[in-house]
From Swiss-Prot:
Disulfide bonds: none annotated. Transmembrane segments: none annotated. GO terms for biological process: mRNA catabolic process. It comes from the Bacteria. Residues 576-658 form the S1 motif domain. This is Exoribonuclease 2. Belongs to the RNR ribonuclease family. RNase II subfamily. The gene is rnb. It is an enzyme of class 3 (hydrolase).
Length: 658
C-alpha cells in the first residue's frame, strides 16, 4: 500500500532536507565516547556511535539536538584513518589473531588473518605491517585486517629501528653489491695525486666524499688571496646512468643516518671503499678550483676537472679543533704539510665566516644530540655536540663549493638540482611584519621598522637578510623561534633561485654524491658541460622524490629518537629527575619542553599548570599561555621540569613544570 506512494516519497525528501549534515574527523577520548572535530566546532559522539568508527576517521554525520544538548549520529565514511598500518600481535581467549594498532589514540582491537606470503609463526607482541580490509561504515562489517609483513619479534631490542623503517616504507638493508665495478670515463682525468689533500671527519666515518687542498695566491711576495681545491668522490664514474644502481639511488635519494648506524644510498663497496677518499689511496674525483681574495670574496669563475686524487691524511674534527684551540696536551699534526694545510684552511675559514656575516647569513649555534648505544641497542648515554672550529672549516669550504657549483650550472647547464628557500610563506608575510613590530617597535623606531619589515621587502633576499641581521642581538629566544613558524619549506628546483635561509642568491650541492642523489645528478650535469654536451633539464619527478625522501628520512630519525628517549628516561621516573628545559611549543593541550642536556621532549599538560581552566588562555599567534591575563609560558622560555611519567607503549614523556 505504501509502495510507490508519492506522499511518502515527498515526506522522506522533506525529512532528508531538514537534516543538518556536518563533516569532520573523529577524535577518541579515554572513555567510550568521542568527538567529531569540524572546521569551526566540535560535536559529541555517544558510545554507541563510536563503535562504528575509530580515531582519525573522516566521516559525514547528522547533528541531533535534544534540549540544549548536541550530538552526532554517524552517517557515512569519507576516509578511513587506517589503510596500511603498524601493529602488535595479540591472541584472544579463543586463540584468534588480533592487532593492537601502534597509535596513541587508537584503542580498537582489530581481528585479523595473515597473508599467505607471511611465513613466520606469529606470537603475542610481535610487530607487523597490516592492511585494513573492512570497516563498519564502508563494508557493513566489523573492523577486520590482514597481516601483510612480519617486522620483528616482541623482544627485539632493535624494534625502534625496524618498526620505524617499516612504518615509513624505508629499506633496512643497503643496496646489494654488484659482482664488479668498472670506471666509465668519458673525460680525461688529470693526475692531482701530488697535491696534499686531506679529509676532516669523525673518526668512525667510512664514506668520505670530500678532500681539500688550499694554498695562498701571491703576487710576488705579497699574498692576495686563496686557492681552494675541492676534491669530491666520483660515484657516477662507476654507475651508468640508467643502471639498476642508479635507479636504487634515485629511489633512496639519501643515506639514512640513524642512531647507531647508517643505511647507505649506494652499496657499501662503493660508499665506504671504491669511492671513499680514504688516505693513501688513488681515487677518482670531480675537482673544483675556487679562488678568493683575502676578504673571502670569490674572484673569477670556478674551474671543474675530472681527476685522480690521493688523500694524504684522515684527520678528526676534535683533534684539529683541539690543536687550533690550543687545548692542553692537544693532538698535533703529524707532518709539516698537514700542519700547513690546517693553518691555511683555518685562516681561509675565518675570512669566509666574516664574509658570510656581512654578505649572507650565519647559522645560529645549536647543539646536535647523539645517542651512544650499547651493542644490544640500549641507550648508554646521550651527548650534545657543538660545531667547533674544524667543523666550521669543512662547513665553510662546502658552502663556498656549493655556491660556485650553482653559478657554474646556472651559467652553463641552465639547469640543476638547486637548493632554494623562499623565506616566509607568502601568506605569512604580513603576520611576520606585525609580530616583528609588536615585539620590537616603540614610538621612536616604529616608522623605520615598518619600512624595514615591509612585506614586499621581507619577500626579497636582501630584505630578508637585513631583517635577520637586525634581530641578531635580540636577547630572548622566542623571537627567533616564533619567526620560524612563518617560514615556508626549503625546496629543490631545476632553475636557480635564492636560498633565503642561507642568505645566498644561488646554491646547489655537489659535495656529497655518495650520500645524496641530487649531488649525483649535479655531477652528471657538470660532466655534460665539460664534455661540451647539451645538458638535460632535471626531471620534475627527481625533485619530487628528493623532497619526499628528505621528509621521510627526517620522520624516521624523529620517530626512532622518540622511542629511544622514552627507553632512556623510563628508569628515571622513580627518581623524579629534574631537567633544565626550554619551551619548544605551546598548544591547546599543554606545553612541550626540550631538555637542554639531551634533547628529549617532555609534555606538560595544561591541567598541571593552573587549577582554574577558565583563567587560562592559549594565544596561538604568540605561541604563549596566559594565566589571569598575564603571560605565563612562551616558546623559548627557560623552565625546570620534573619527570613524572613515561609511557613506553606510546613513547610519550610527561612532566610537571616546577
Amino acid at each position: 500500500m505504501f509502495q510507490n506512494n508519492p506522499l511518502l516519497a515527498q515526506l522522506k525528501q522533506q525529512i532528508e532536507a531538514n537534516k543538518e549534515y556536518v563533516e569532520g574527523t573523529v577524535k577518541a577520548s579515554d572513555k567510550a565516547f568521542g568527538f567529531l572535530e569540524c572546521d569551526k566546532k566540535s560535536y559529541f559522539i555517544p558510545p554507541m556511535e563510536m563503535k562504528k568508527v575509530m580515531h582519525g576517521d573522516k566521516v559525514k554525520a547528522v547533528v541531533k539536538r535534544e534540549d540544549d544538548k548536541e550530538q552526532v549520529e554517524i552517517d557515512s565514511l569519507l576516509e578511513p584513518m587506517l589503510d596500511r598500518f603498524i601493529a602488535q600481535v595479540r591472541f584472544n581467549k579463543d586463540n584468534k589473531l588480533q592487532l593492537i594498532v601502534d597509535h596513541p589514540s587508537i584503542k580498537n582491537i582489530i581481528p585479523a588473518n595473515t597473508h599467505k606470503k607471511v611465513t613466520e609463526t606469529l606470537e603475542s607482541g610481535d610487530w607487523v605491517v597490516a592492511q585494513l580490509k573492512t570497516h563498519p561504515l564502508r563494508d557493513d562489517r566489523f573492523l577486520f585486517a590482514q597481516v601483510t609483513q612480519f617486522i620483528c619479534k616482541a623482544d627485539d631490542n632493535f624494534a625502534p629501528w625496524w618498526v620505524t623503517l617499516a612504518r615509513h616504507e624505508q629499506p633496512r638493508e643497503p643496496v646489494a653489491n654488484e659482482k664488479s665495478y668498472e670506471l666509465h670515463d668519458e673525460l680525461d682525468r688529470e693526475d692531482l695525486t701530488s697535491l696534499y689533500f686531506t679529509t676532516i671527519d669523525s673518526p668512525s666515518t667510512q664514506d668520505m666524499d670530500d678532500a681539500l687542498y688550499i694554498e695562498p695566491i701571491k703576487q710576488g711576495e705579497v699574498q692576495t688571496g686563496w686557492r681552494l681545491v675541492v676534491a669530491i668522490a666520483d660515484p657516477t664514474a662507476y654507475i651508468p646512468e640508467n643502471s639498476n644502481l642508479e635507479k636504487a639511488a634515485r629511489q633512496r635519494c639519501f643515506t639514512n643516518y640513524l642512531p647507531g648506524f647508517n643505511i647507505p644510498m649506494l652499496p657499501r663497496e662503493l660508499s665506504d671503499d671504491l669511492c671513499s677518499l680514504v688516505p693513501n689511496e688513488k681515487r677518482p674525483a670531480l675537482v673544483g678550483y675556487i679562488e678568493t681574495d683575502l676578504a673571502g670574496n670569490i674572484t673569477g669563475d670556478t674551474r671543474f676537472v675530472s681527476a685522480w686524487v690521493e688523500s694524504k691524511a684522515k684527520l678528526a674534527y676534535d683533534n684539529v679543533s683541539d690543536y687550533l684551540e690550543q687545548v692542553e696536551n692537544a693532538w698535533q699534526p703529524e707532518s709539516a704539510e698537514t700542519k700547513q694545510q690546517i693553518d691555511w684552511l683555518h685562516q681561509f675559514t675565518l675570512a669566509r665566516i666574516e664574509w658570510r656575516r656581512n654578505n649572507a647569513l650565519l647559522f645560529k649555534e645549536s647543539g646536535d644530540y647523539s645517542f651512544e648505544l650499547n651493542e644490544d641497542g640500549s641507550v648508554r648515554d646521550i651527548h650534545v655536540e657543538y660545531r667547533r672550529i674544524a667543523n666550521q672549516m669543512i662547513e665553510e669550504s662546502m658552502i663556498i663549493a656549493n655556491i660556485c657549483c650553482a653559478k657554474f650550472l646556472a651559467d652553463n647547464a641552465k639547469t640543476g638540482v638547486f637548493n632554494t628557500h623562499a623565506g616566509f610563506d607568502p601568506k605569512n608575510l604580513e603576520l611576520a611584519q606585525k609580530f616583528l613590530l609588536d615585539t620590537l617597535a616603540n614610538d621612536e623606531n616604529r616608522d623605520a621598522l615598518t619600512a624595514l619589515y615591509a612585506p614586499e621587502k621581507l619577500a626579497t633576499l636582501e630584505g630578508y637578510c637585513e631583517m635577520r641581521r637586525s634581530i641578531d642581538e635580540f636577547p630572548e629566544k622566542f623571537l627567533e623561534l616564533r619567526l620560524r613558524r612563518y617560514l615556508t619549506f626549503a625546496e629543490f628546483k631545476s632553475e636557480v633561485a635564492p636560498h633565503l635561509g642561507l642568505g645566498i642568491s644561488h646554491y646547489a650541492t655537489w659535495t656529497s654524491p655518495i650520500r645524496k642523489y641530487g649531488d649525483m645528478v649535479n655531477h652528471r650535469l657538470i660532466k655534460q658541460v665539460l664534455l661540451g654536451k647539451q645538458a638535460k633539464t632535471v626531471e620534475e619527478g627527481i625533485l619530487v622524490r628528493l623532497q619526499e625522501a628528505r621528509r621521510q628520512n627526517r620522520l624516521v630519525e624523529r620517530d626512532i629518537a622518540d622511542w629511544l628517549y622514552a627507553r632512556y628516561l623510563f628508569p628515571m621516573v622513580e627518581q623524579a629527575v629534574e631537567f633544565d628545559c626550554e619551551i619548544a611549543d605551546v598548544s591547546r593541550g599543554g606545553v612541550r619542553a626540550k631538555v637542554i642536556a639531551n634533547g628529549a621532549q617532555i609534555f606538560v599538560p595544561f591541567s598541571t599548570l593552573h587549577d582554574k581552566k577558565e583563567e587560562m588562555e592559549f594565544r596561538p599567534e604568540e605561541i604563549a599561555l596566559y594565566i589571569k591575563g598575564e603571560k605565563a609560558y612562551q616558546i623559548g622560555q627557560a623552565v625546570k621540569v620534573k619527570l613524572t611519567e613515561v609511557r613506553l607503549e606510546t613513547r610519550s614523556i610527561v612532566g610537571n613544570i616546577i
